[in-house]
């Protein structure tokens, strides 16, 4: 017929709702993808923090080792009656020999002190890197939280439109059935009238 039936109108509404639903679903897919990416960034940043912490602990252990080494040697050198100290004095055949041995010991101590300093500097750099990684992790965490809210909102919109579409589809199907039943009834009535008038 030239006029759209109520079922056609309802089906057109359902089709429009389906288009919106598909658009919302695409939004949801994108938002979910963004959330997954943000979450991965957060995990990566947190892994960097853990790695930096591990390296800091290793450097701290190194520093302690060097400091103990320095302390032991200093005690050996300066403690009265120390074997090393006596060896330096008694083992020296001349003053030049004594001075050379003493200088070697001092150089060793300076080398150790330098090692301690270098290791401390390395630890400070690691601590700075850890702080930076923690800041990145915080930013990534905020981004992930924001992305999750967007995804949740998109999910709610899609679910709402799904319900609208399902409702309209059901109504359209019901109207089609009613129209078919009415048409069948009209045909039956027309047939009865034809028989009666025949």
Language-model regions: role of each:
Residues 82-86:
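Envelope-exposed proteins and targeting segments
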Residues 94:
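Active-site helix-to-loop segments that bind/position phosphate- or nucleotide-bearing substrates
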Residues 2-76, 102-198:
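Alpha-helical oligomerization segments with coiled-coil/rod-like character
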